[in-house]
Structures are given as C-alpha cells and as structure tokens.
A protein has these predicted regions:
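Active-site loop segments of alpha/beta catalytic cores
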Residues: 1-51, 63, 68, 75-83, ...
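Conserved active-site "lid/cap" helical segment
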Residues: 60
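A contiguous, low-structure linker/loop signature
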Residues: 81-116
Length: 246
C-alpha cells in the first residue's frame, strides 16, 4: 500500500500508542481542502444528477471520494480514508430500514413491514449496496488511501432505527424478554456483516473507520448507544451493556 500520506508510518505508531493508552492523536472529524496541494491529478466527477446518485450510486461516490481524498489535507495524523458512510446506523437499513438521501446526510426510516422478526437477508438491496460501494471505492483507491468502514452502529440504536424509538422504549416494559432476544439477534448479524465488510476494505490486517477517522492494525469498532439517554440505568445494564461488551 502506497498512500498519499507521507507520514503514515509515524501516524500508525501514534495510533498504536493511543490504543495502549499512551499519547494523543492529532486528527479531525473529516478533512479540509483549503490551501491543499492535490496529491494526484484526479478530476472531480460531473455533479450528481440527484440525491440518489449522490449517496447510492457506488461508481459516482467512488469517483467523488477519489477526488475528495486527493484534494484533502493529510497533515498531522489526519488519515487518508474514504468516508463510505450510508447513514448513521446503516445496519438498520441492511435489516429492512428505508434509506432517504438528504442534502448533507442519509436518513434511515423504520421498516414499515417490521414484525419483530430480526432476519438477515443476503439478497437485500441495501446489503448489496454496502458491498458494491466498498468494492467500488477499494478498486478506485488503488492503495492510495483506506476505504473506511461504514457507520453500522449497534444494538438498541439499530433496533430503534428499524422499528421506531417510541416502540423500542415501550418494549423495555411490555416485552423485555423479546427485546433481549432481538438484541442478541442483532449482535449475531452485526458480527457477520462486519466481518464480510472488513474483508473487502482491509489492507493486510489493517483497517480504518470513516467516522472519527480512526485506524487500527487489526479489527476495530466504534461502540455507542444514543438511546441510552432515554432509558434507566437498570435498562442500560440489561439491554445495552451486555451486548456492547460482547
């Protein structure tokens, strides 16, 4: 891998120190282009025809991200990584949630036909889109930058996106045993999905995560639970903590 970042090896060492609770990383959420000398002569693609192409056309996004990284600052510990996100919590879309492209983000709406069954369909178009996007970006990157892992999210947040937050909150009282079972099902699917996407984006064993622009010498994940602000400590320990720990 020959990236456009000239000090990548130094940055890797600082990340390894950081994973071992030493030192700091000087990074940023995304990238900036102002005053940057391009790393390569990569032309920008034609403007997206609409929001669907902007977010859901793998080839267009791969071309855009190739241009974007080539024209972005990679100083300090800023990583050369393509942001392949398909919305926050896109595991919910893989499981049946509905995509909606916005101007600045992707919204994921609940599955209108959700019936409390958590089923992974390997032929679901949203799952196929995830893989096609990563493969297109990996081919375009040609070793010049990492292809980031999308923001799949985990657990209760995924179910809230898939079913609706209000309904999930009611489930903590009305059907807690069913909710626990669903959390385990989501975890099991998460690991399957993550591993398959990791095998697409990995560089050796290394990977990068597009949100928070993080790097690791092996598998890593970002863990969170936004819905935890709306539940009790006891419910957090029952419905969130065990599955994040897993």
């Amino acid at each position: 891998m020959e990236t456009w970042k000239t000090n990548l090896e130094e940055t890797k060492k600082r990340y390894i120190d950081w994973w071992n609770h030493k030192g700091i990383i000087l990074n940023m959420w995304e990238h900036f282009q102002k005053g940057v000398k391009p790393h390569a002569d990569i032309p920008a693609p034609a403007p997206a025809k609409d929001l669907n192409q902007k977010w859901f056309d793998p080839q267009w996004r791969a071309e855009y991200l190739d241009w974007y990284v080539a024209h972005s600052s990679l100083k300090a510990d800023i990583l050369p990584v393509a942001n392949t996100q398909l919305g926050p919590g896109s595991l919910a879309a893989i499981l049946g949630g509905v995509f909606e492209g916005g101007e600045d983000t992707i919204w994921i709406h609940p599955d209108p036909d959700f019936n409390d069954e958590i089923v992974f369909n390997p032929e679901h178009p949203n799952w196929i889109l995830h893989k096609e996007l990563l493969k297109a970006c990996k081919a375009k990157a040609n070793g010049h930058y990492y292809v980031g892992m999308p923001d799949l999210m985990e657990g209760l947040d995924v179910l809230a996106a898939l079913k609706g937050t209000d309904k999930v909150l009611l489930d903590t009282v009305m059907q807690p045993e069913v909710l626990e079972q669903q959390m385990q099902q989501i975890n099991d699917i998460y690991f399957k999905v993550f591993d398959e996407l990791y095998d697409i984006i990995r560089e050796g064993d290394e990977m990068a995560f597009c949100y928070f622009s993080s790097w690791a010498p092996g598998k890593m994940s970002k863990l969170q639970s936004d819905i935890s602000t709306m539940i009790s400590e006891d419910d957090y320990r029952r419905f969130v903590q065990p599955f994040i720990r897993e």
